[in-house]
């Protein structure tokens, strides 16, 4: 039986993309991921995450990271909620890695509702396939090694993209999270000098809006 784990990195930042990681393996190999030492990516050092990401890709039957740019997020938010965007983004990973069982980190206060939306979204597109089982849980990256692995791939990819932004911009933008003093300082300085934000910024975020208004 094929199983897939899905998790996101970068849902909350004001700078940079959101990355949705997916890892597919045979269910009887899930212990191999656990033995690698995968854990929630937030608890690992960047160096350890990079090392584990390479190992995960070797063990996985398939893997995929779906990226949603700041501009895409801004445009979609004109039409739908962030939860709706998460359903679409997770759905894109499921499309890439179809499986018998789907473990997802719930991106909704009601975890069952998020799982049902993922299921309905998939079955609407594939009415003739055997229905997958969907397990949607808060903290799934702590509960299921396959989701921990997906979390690591998502975080490593976002970290790579943030580092590229720093190089391209020639300035330290920090982590991109609204609470980061370096990020706030970058936004303040950039807007003061340019009266607008570059496309690396999510203009629809309150952190950015307070400068624009």
Curated annotation (Swiss-Prot):
InterPro entries: RNase_H2_suA, RNase_HII/HIII, RNase_HII/HIII_dom, RNase_HII_arc, RNase_HII_hlx-loop-hlx_cap_dom, RNaseH-like_sf, RNaseH_sf. It holds the Pfam family RNase_HII. Manganese or magnesium. Binds 1 divalent metal ion per monomer in the absence of substrate. May bind a second metal ion after substrate binding. GO terms for biological process: DNA replication, removal of RNA primer; mismatch repair. Its main location: cytoplasm. Its cofactor is Mn(2+); Mg(2+). It is found in: Cytoplasm. It catalyses: Endonucleolytic cleavage to 5'-phosphomonoester. Residues 1-213 form the RNase H type-2 domain. Coiled coil: none annotated. CDD domains: RNase_HII_archaea_like (cd07180). A divalent metal cation binds at residues 7-8, 105. Keywords: Cytoplasm, Endonuclease, Hydrolase, Manganese, Metal-binding, Nuclease. One of its GO terms (molecular function) is manganese ion binding. Its EC number is 3.1.26.4. GO terms for cellular component: cytoplasm; ribonuclease H2 complex. Belongs to the RNase HII family. NCBIfam families: ribonuclease HII. Endonuclease that specifically degrades the RNA of RNA-DNA hybrids. This is Ribonuclease HII. It comes from Methanococcoides burtonii (strain DSM 6242 / NBRC 107633 / OCM 468 / ACE-M). The lineage of its organism: Archaea, Methanobacteriati, Methanobacteriota, Stenosarchaea group, Methanomicrobia.
